Each structure stands twice: as structure tokens, then as C-alpha cells.
């Protein structure tokens, strides 16, 4: 893989910034990029006009104890939030309206994920996974996993992937039947599926990355990380995987027979550990954020082309980076409650 980096260029241009009342932990752009939805750790929701940054509506303490997770519907004006109160709320984006409240009782709602077609919402609460229709009606729930469910993700074939200690499981999205189990002794802290859903990659508590090819169930491990690789992102083609786990962004090539037997590319500019990574929806732009608030946009090129980059910063540790659906804007959230949007 031939990717190089040059000196910073002016690729990221200032857009707008705002503050929410606590740690900005999750959210995202709505399906058409007109609004940006942000949730803070105290349980507040803020819906911003995507162009101006003006608050369309906000509401505090929607979950007692705080919000833990949020998921933006991929095709319609609704989103879901989950909290420490054991509740999932499905909201109307523009009308400040609760369309459905689901109460699972005791337990934290740590993960939410919409299927790619938006027809199903997956929820994890402790060791159990629930799947609902987009209106919030239960379709099925799983038996208990081996441990707390740490990640959720949907394949393009309407399969739900889950992680817990020692296992990745794939469920049929409609029936809840277990279709595949991929096992490895270790605590899996992060997960990403390749765009074609054949490769599943997990960051592990032991500072390694483990991945499987689902078609063969062949597994491999990539070691040498000083920290837990909690940030993972595939490019749109599934050819390149960006990983955190240190102050460097490590890029593995899945082209040909890779990454086995190949050396990764290390992108060196951050001085503190990587906290979040996000490839653009199209092309090879990669955004990275780190613990000191630095945000870098890498314009990666292959085939011996150089890559430009642009560096900026936010107030504190970067919690999330979200590309607008058209990739012409990037939103960054930080630990101090800062919300920053740049034009690309």
C-alpha cells in the first residue's frame, strides 16, 4: 500500500460551533444532512440546523441518569435514544415528539443500531439483545449472551452482529435465529463490519485486533498496539481499515491477500491517543480525533499519489466525528460539550 502524507493544507474550513450542557457523547446527521442531532451525558438532546448551527429544539434530562446511546434513522426523520433508566425513546426529529417509549426496566441501554433499510432497531441491555420494528414493536429478543453485549452492527443482509466476551454472533434479523458464531477468548471492546459484511473486525481488551472472514471463518490477529484499539473504520470499498490503539493512525490493506503478511501504514501527526476515526461515505478522506482535542483530515491516495491533510482542534478529548451524508461537512463532538462543524 502506497500512501504518503504531506504538510497540512486548508482542507477543513470553519463552519459553526455550539455547546451542550455536558459531555457530548453521541448523535449524528439526519438522513439528508439538514439537521445535526447531539446527545449529552446528562440526558439532554439538541437538534441543530445543519447549516447555521441554530438550535431547532432541545430538551434536557430525557433519560434519568443520562443518555448512553443514540442512533439516527438512515431514511426518515426519526432517531432513538437509550439511557441508564432502561428506556428506549423513538423521537420525531423535527417535531420534538416521542413516537414510542420502550421500558425494559432495570439495566442500561448501552447500544442502539438501525438496520441499513431502517426497518429494524436493535437494542442491547446487559446480556440481552432486543429487535424492534421502526415503530418500536418488539420482533424478538435473544437468550442471554456470555457477558454484557459490547457492540451491535447490521450486515447488508439484515443480519445482526453482536459481541460479548469471547464471541461474535450473527442473528437473522427477522427471526432471531443464530446463524454464525465466531469465537476467540478475549474481551471485544469494538467492532466494525466491512461494507460487504464478509469481514468482521474487533478491537480487544488485550491491545490486539482480531478479525474473521465470514465466508471461510478464517481468523487472524494483529498485535503491537500499546492501547486498546477502540476506534475502527473501513473505507467505502472495504479495501482499507483504519485503527486506533496509539497516537498513530494505523491503516491495514485488505486488498489481494492482505493484511496477512503485509506491513501497515502509520499516519503520524497526533501526539495523544486516537479516540475516534471516520472514513467519508465516498472516497478516501479519513477523519481522526485524539485525546487532546486534535482533529486531522487525511486525504489518502493510493497508487503512489501523495495525500494532503488538514489539522484543527476542539476544546477537549474528541468523542465522535460524523460526516454529513454528502461528505461536504464534518461534525466533531468533545468532552467539554463542544459541537463543531467544519466545511470540507
PLM-predicted stretches and their roles:
Residues 17-24, 60-67, 103-109, 143-149, ...:
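WD40/WD-repeat beta-propeller blade N-cap
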Residues 31-32, 74-75, 116-117, 155-156, ...:
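Residue-level detector of Asp-centered blade-edge/turn motifs that repeat once per structural unit
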Residues 50-52, 93-96, 133-137, 173-176, ...:
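Short loop/turn segments that connect beta-strands within beta-propeller blades
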Residues 39-42, 82-85, 124-126, 163-165, ...:
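Conserved strand-to-loop turn within each blade of WD40 beta-propeller repeats
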Residues 36, 79, 121, 160-161, ...:
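Hydrophobic beta-strand positions that form the internal "hydrophobic ladder"
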Residues 2-22:
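A short helix->beta-strand "capping" segment at the edge of beta-propeller domains
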Residues 46-48, 88-91, 130-133, 169-172, ...:
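WD40-repeat beta-propellers
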Amino acid at each position: 500500500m502506497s500512501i504518503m502524507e504531506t504538510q497540512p493544507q486548508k482542507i477543513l474550513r470553519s463552519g459553526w460551533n455550539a455547546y451542550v450542557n455536558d459531555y457530548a457523547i453521541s448523535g449524528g446527521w439526519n438522513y439528508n444532512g439538514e439537521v445535526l442531532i447531539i446527545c449529552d451525558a446528562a440526558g439532554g438532546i439538541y437538534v441543530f440546523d445543519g447549516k447555521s448551527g441554530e438550535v431547532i429544539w432541545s430538551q434536557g434530562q430525557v433519560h434519568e441518569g443520562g443518555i448512553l446511546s443514540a442512533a439516527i434513522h438512515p431514511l426518515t426523520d426519526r432517531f432513538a435514544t437509550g439511557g441508564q433508566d432502561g428506556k428506549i425513546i423513538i423521537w420525531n426529529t423535527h417535531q420534538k415528539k416521542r413516537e414510542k417509549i420502550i421500558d425494559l426496566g432495570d439495566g442500561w441501554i448501552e447500544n442502539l443500531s438501525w438496520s441499513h433499510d431502517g426497518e429494524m432497531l436493535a437494542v442491547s441491555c446487559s446480556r440481552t439483545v432486543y429487535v424492534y420494528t421502526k415503530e418500536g414493536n418488539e420482533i424478538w429478543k435473544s437468550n442471554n449472551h456470555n457477558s454484557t453485549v459490547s457492540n451491535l452492527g447490521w450486515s447488508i443482509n439484515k443480519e445482526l452482529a453482536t459481541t460479548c466476551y469471547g464471541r461474535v454472533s450473527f442473528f437473522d434479523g427477522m427471526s432471531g435465529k443464530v446463524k454464525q458464531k465466531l469465537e476467540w477468548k478475549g474481551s471485544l471492546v469494538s467492532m466494525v463490519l466491512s461494507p460487504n459484511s464478509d469481514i468482521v473486525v474487533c478491537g480487544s481488551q488485550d491491545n490486539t485486533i482480531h478479525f474473521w472472514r465470514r465466508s471461510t471463518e478464517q481468523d487472524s490477529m494483529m498485535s503491537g498496539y500499546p492501547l486498546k484499539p477502540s476506534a475502527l473504520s473501513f473505507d467505502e470499498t472495504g479495501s482499507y481499515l483504519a485503527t486506533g490503539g496509539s497516537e498513530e493512525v494505523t491503516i491495514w490493506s485488505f486488498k489481494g491477500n492482505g493484511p496477512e503478511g503485509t506491513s501497515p501504514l502509520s499516519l503520524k501527526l497526533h501526539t495523544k491517543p486516537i479516540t475516534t476515526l471516520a472514513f467519508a461515505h465516498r472516497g478516501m478522506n479519513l477523519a481522526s480525533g485524539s485525546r487532546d482535542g486534535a482533529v486531522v483530515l487525511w486525504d489518502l491516495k493510493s497508487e503512489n499519489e501523495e495525500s494532503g491533510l488538514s489539522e484543527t482542534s476542539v476544546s477537549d478529548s474528541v468523542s465522535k466525528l460524523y460526516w454529513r451524508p454528502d461528505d461536504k461537512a464534518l461534525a466533531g463532538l468533545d468532552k467539554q460539550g463542544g459541537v463543531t462543524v467544519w466545511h470540507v
